[in-house]
């Protein structure tokens, strides 16, 4: 009876789409098996939906069906641990929010400091992108910009040319201090990312903060970006 009451109170306080774990219900560990059975009964009648083992959410129902949780809810345990930021959403979902694509996807990419194998939670396939820089709330927008440059061939429903134009606008809107931070973070990325970032900065009349010095002067980079979009690309050995 106590378990049923705590479940009812917890669900009443939870927003639609908020992912709840077993620990969120405040039930002693020795009663977790009973709790899981009670939650699974609610899944069976449609009151709850299951994301993965031990993870549930209260679905918001519309005329088109139940809405899935936001990507940040599905992977929130991968984004923060003990109050510290340990990951961030990148890839198509993040690029859409940046105006780089209109593609909608259930796939989620998480930037993290260590390699992890892809996993599946409900209908969402989760992949991981190793991020060599430290991850903080402050630098996440910059890391996403660098990820977009790194993955420029893979951004869906657009072209590398169009993505380069949008990235130019995003980067040009940064303050000089943030531009310098962007270039510092870029030093941990592969040379082709630094070359393309440098070309975008130069083409938009922005300082490059010595990015050219970090590159091998005889190495060339094959990137599918036209001279119409980056007329200065040969300055950065981009073919």
Q: How would you label these PLM feature ranges?
A:
Residues 64-65, 80-84, 131-138:
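Short, surface-exposed loop/turn motifs that are enriched in glycine and acidic residues
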Residues 2-80:
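Short beta-edge/loop segments at beta->alpha junctions of small alpha/beta modules
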Residues 22-23, 107, 161:
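Short coil/turn segments at secondary-structure boundaries
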Residues 135-239:
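Hydrophobic alpha-helical interaction segments
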Residues 51-54, 83-121:
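Short gly/ser-rich loop at a beta-strand->alpha-helix junction or flexible surface loop bordering the NTP-binding
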Residues 41-44, 94-96, 100, 151:
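Short, intrinsically disordered, mixed-charge
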Residues 119-130, 137:
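A short, charged helix-loop
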Residues 35, 90-91, 141:
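Amphipathic alpha-helical interface surfaces
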């Amino acid at each position: 009876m106590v378990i049923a009451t705590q479940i009812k109170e917890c669900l009443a306080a939870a927003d639609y789409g908020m992912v709840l774990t077993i620990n969120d219900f405040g039930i002693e560990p020795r009663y977790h098996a009973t709790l899981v059975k009670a939650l699974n009964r609610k899944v069976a009648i449609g009151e709850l939906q299951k994301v993965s083992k031990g993870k549930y959410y209260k679905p918001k129902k519309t005329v088109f069906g139940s809405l899935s949780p936001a990507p940040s809810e599905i992977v929130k345990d991968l984004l923060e641990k003990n109050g510290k930021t340990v990951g961030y959403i990148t890839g198509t979902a993040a690029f859409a929010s940046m105006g780089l694509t209109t593609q909608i996807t259930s796939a989620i990419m998480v930037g993290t400091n260590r390699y992890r194998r892809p996993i599946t939670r409900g209908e969402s396939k989760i992949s991981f992108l190793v991020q060599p820089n430290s991850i903080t709330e402050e630098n996440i927008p910059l890391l996403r910009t660098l990820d977009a440059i790194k993955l420029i061939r893979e951004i869906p429903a657009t072209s590398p040319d169009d993505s380069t134009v949008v990235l130019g606008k995003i980067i040009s809107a940064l303050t000089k201090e943030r531009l310098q931070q962007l270039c510092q973070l870029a030093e941990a990325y592969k040379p082709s990312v630094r070359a393309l970032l440098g070309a975008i900065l130069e083409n938009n009349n922005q300082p490059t903060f010595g990015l050219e010095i970090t590159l091998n002067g005889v190495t060339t980079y094959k990137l599918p970006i036209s001279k119409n979009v980056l007329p200065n690309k040969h300055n950065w050995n981009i073919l």
